[in-house]
Regions:
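Active-site bordering "gate/hinge" segments
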Residues: 1-386, 555, 559-569
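Generic beta-strand/beta-sheet core signal
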Residues: 143, 291, 340-342, 354, ...
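Short, glycine-/Ser/Thr-/acidic-enriched flexible segments
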Residues: 147, 244-246, 295, 344, ...
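Short solvent-exposed loop/turn micro-motifs enriched in small/polar/acidic residues
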Residues: 332, 400-403, 443, 476
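Long, well-ordered mid-to-C-terminal structural blocks that present hydrophobic/aromatic surfaces
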Residues: 382-441
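Active-site lining segments that contact anionic ligands and/or coordinate catalytic metals
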Residues: 387-389, 404-406, 413, 445-449, ...
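Dual-mode signal for accessory low-complexity, basic/Gly-rich regions
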Residues: 418-490, 494
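Extended hydrophobic packing segments that form well-structured cores
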Residues: 502-569
Length: 569
């Protein structure tokens, strides 16, 4: 029903009308007394089922069609010095959005230009780094937090110079299209984060096999309808934010939850939906970029932190590229990597690496500089699952907007066999939180990535301003080793060659599970990739273990120890 607010702003009168009809239908049920659950469920189920063929195609179109310019016209045509423009978006506008826009307006022109240029140049470099071309592509989707319009306006101009017309759709709304993390478009600060958490599984009211089949059928027809627009789409350019106050959810007894059967239906829908999308927008033909900036909520030193973030986002990528290559040269001689924590961190984990057939031409690690993931600072691989064993433990880590306390995941042959945290009083609630927020409702997941972050500059800034728990995973993953559960970084693109700056091919693009993709894609992918970082302060050692049993320390006592990497300290 709350979607009617957006529909009113966008003059979508038919959509407002059908929601009002639903409201009246439900209201009438209460006129004769309190209806039963089944009686209430029926109109909700048939509303979603009947109008899915209206709501879902619209969402597909608005993420592909630049002529739907409701948000873009506000950004490009408004007087950004008059902050009343923010209220034209139809989103909740808090003091955060007002303060952000006010701050952006006060920045020097060259500073905002530098932010926009770094963002759009990262997008361009992303295509170049993967050997792809955006020639023939005509559109790019911009996703961002409301308040950054001055930067986004410049980014629109930059993308147009590249021959790409920006699509700026709002984050999805309505139960049929809504994502758990509502950041797949332009969006504002949630009015109530507990409310968002409570309603994350409202689809439990109507999700069954028949609806799953209907939604997949409609999705296929929608992409077929808009296949010409899909064929010229180059991929998303994302501006993330950080600095919000920590959020610890409370499990409300009245909130909906998915049954085990519904969880399986949702996962199977996600897998098949990805296959449909990839058929019309092949991952081998697109790219992306992500950059992050702080929000005023981060505290009194917001302005200083903002300037430091710009510095972090524009570090000398050549320096990091060369140091990271030294690390890769050593890691490529290893068969395993061992990671151990210190102090209260109980991490004791061995990651198995793939065997290189031609070491002079191949590498196990990608040398990641500032292109698709800004800022610079990591080397990463897809571990071999067999032989990857041990405990991953982090005392405190933010994943999305949730702070996990004493997170533990134990791996056997690369698969998570147990997991827990200390957020709630009962073990059942703790396991459920990890399953929902990290494993995305899968019973278990493989380790899809192992990486070593090298951005000690960001780490120093985090310590100096006391914001270690505020940085988003985009930056946090560069501040220590990190591990991802779920798909590899190369899902749906394993067969697309990737080369490091030294000319060697990064060949560790699949694992034993994603290798099933050609015979059975449904068993090869999970539709999720969740990063978990161990901060340097909790890290003791990362050592490369050679096939003959000898080892070389990459990090010792939380500091870089490999000769040639000392500058990172």
């Amino acid at each position: 029903i709350r979607s009617a607010i957006v529909y009113a702003y966008e003059s979508r009168l038919v959509d407002v009308t059908v929601l009002e009809e639903l409201f009246i239908e439900v209201y009438n049920l209460f006129e004769g007394g309190t209806p039963g659950v089944a009686e209430l469920r029926e109109p909700l189920y048939y509303f979603v089922s009947d109008y899915c063929d209206r709501m879902l195609p619209w969402r597909v179109r608005e993420t592909l069609d630049p002529s739907l310019d409701f948000g873009k016209s506000i950004i490009m045509d408004s007087d950004l010095n008059d902050l009343r423009y923010l209220y034209r978006f139809g989103e909740y506008i808090s003091e955060t959005e007002l303060a952000t826009a006010r701050f952006m307006n006060e920045l020097p022109e060259e500073t905002v230009r530098r932010m926009a240029d770094t963002y759009t140049e990262g997008y361009r470099k992303g295509f170049a780094a993967t050997g792809r071309s955006y020639e023939g592509k005509k559109t790019v989707q911009i996703r961002y937090h409301i308040g950054f319009e001055r930067m986004i306006r410049m980014a629109v101009e930059n993308f147009r110079e590249l021959g790409l017309e920006p699509i700026i759709a709002r984050a999805s709304i309505g139960t049929v299209n809504r994502m758990a993390a509502r950041t797949n478009g332009y969006y504002g600060t949630p009015a109530n984060r507990q409310y968002e958490y409570d309603h994350r599984y409202d689809n439990a009211v109507y999700l069954d096999k028949a609806f799953r089949e209907r939604k997949l059928s409609i999705l296929k027809v929608a992409y077929e309808t808009y296949k010409d627009l899909a064929s010229v789409y180059a991929g998303p350019a994302v501006v993330e934010t950080f600095g919000e106050a920590g959020f610890e959810p409370v499990n409300a007894a009245a909130a909906f939850s998915l049954s085990e059967k519904q969880e399986k239906l949702l996962l199977s829908y996600s897998n098949e939906a990805m296959q449909i999308v990839d058929a019309y927008i092949p991952g081998t033909e697109t790219s992306f970029t992500i950059i992050a900036f702080p929000l005023p909520e981060i505290g009194a030193e917001f302005e200083a932190i903002f300037k430091e973030t710009i510095r972090i986002n524009t570090l000398d990528y050549e320096l990091y590229r060369d140091i990271q290559q030294i690390m890769i040269n050593e890691l490529d001689q290893a068969s395993q990597v061992h990671i151990s924590g210190r102090g209260g961190n109980r991490t004791d984990l061995t990651v198995q690496l793939h065997t290189l057939a031609e070491p002079t031409k191949q590498s196990n690690f990608e040398n990641c500089v500032a292109d698709v993931n800004i800022p610079v600072g990591e080397v990463f691989t897809s571990p071999q699952l067999a032989g990857t064993n041990g405990l991953l433990h982090v005392g405190s880590v933010y994943i999305g907007e949730f702070q996990f306390k004493d997170l533990e995941i134990r791996f056997e042959n690369g698969i998570a066999v147990s997991y827990t945290c200390k957020n709630f009083e009962t073990e059942e609630e703790n396991k459920a939180l990890v399953k929902q927020m990290i494993l995305k409702n899968h019973e278990t997941l493989p380790m899809g990535e192992f990486a070593i972050g090298t951005n000690t500059t960001a780490y120093e800034v985090a310590l100096r301003y006391g914001i270690l728990d505020k940085f988003p995973i985009l930056i946090a993953e560069k501040m220590g080793p990190h591990f991802a559960v779920g798909d590899t970084c190369y899902s749906w693109m394993e067969d697309c060659p990737v080369f490091n700056p030294d000319g060697r091919e990064m060949v560790a693009r699949e694992n034993e599970i994603s290798a099933k993709r050609k015979e059975n894609p449904q068993e090869a992918y999970f539709g999720c990739h969740t990063d978990i970082t161990i901060p340097y302060s909790e890290l003791d050692t990362i050592e490369a273990i050679h096939p003959d049993g000898t080892s070389v320390k990459i990090i010792a006592g939380g500091r870089f120890a490999l000769p040639g990497t000392e500058k990172l300290n």
